[in-house]
From Swiss-Prot:
Record's function text: This protein is one of the early assembly proteins of the 50S ribosomal subunit, although it is not seen to bind rRNA by itself. It is important during the early stages of 50S assembly.
Pfam family, one: Ribosomal_L13
Top-level lineage group: Bacteria
GO cellular component annotations of the record: cytosolic large ribosomal subunit; ribosome
Organism expressing this protein natively: Coxiella burnetii (strain RSA 493 / Nine Mile phase I)
Name of the protein described by the UniProt record: Large ribosomal subunit protein uL13
């Protein structure tokens, strides 16, 4: 008997809703990355997008342990000499709270075309409202 390999025709994604209020950043990000990959399903296949859509709400209420609120730095570069920009966790959470979780999850997904496809299935919102009510997402507790 041949080994089962999932493909786009056999996989049916679900919509899941995650409330990030009071959750720790890294633990939440790793669980969401596994769901996006489809590792929670029996038919997981490494080279196939077998994951589910994930809608995350209340990311403005994420927490981190220790002194990371002030010590954790996020860097990006403009490409020009002297163009390194740095912002700490507290300031980024005040300006763009969804960007923190986006960066954490994106780093945990595969690099390349499959990783970009999986990343598009992630929807992150700072408040408790989201525009995906029509998909009837199931609330899960991580």
């Amino acid at each position: 008997m041949a080994t089962y390999m999932a493909n786009a025709k056999t996989v049916s994604p679900r919509w899941l809703l995650v409330n990030a209020e009071g959750k720790t950043l890294g633990r939440l990000a790793s669980r969401i990355a596994a769901i996006l990959r489809g590792k929670h399903k029996a038919e997981f296949t490494p080279h196939v997008d077998a994951g589910d859509f994930v809608v995350v709400i209340n990311v403005d209420k994420l927490k981190v342990t220790g002194n990371k609120t002030q010590d954790k730095q996020y860097h990006h570069h403009s490409g020009y000499p002297g163009g390194l920009k740095t912002i700490n966790f507290a300031d980024l959470q005040a300006k763009k709270p969804q960007r923190i979780l986006e960066l954490a999850i994106k780093g945990m997904l595969p690099k390349g075309p499959l990783g970009r496809q999986l990343y598009r299935k992630l929807k992150i919102y700072a408040g408790d409202q989201h525009p995906h009510q029509a998909q009837q997402p199931e609330l899960i507790d991580l």
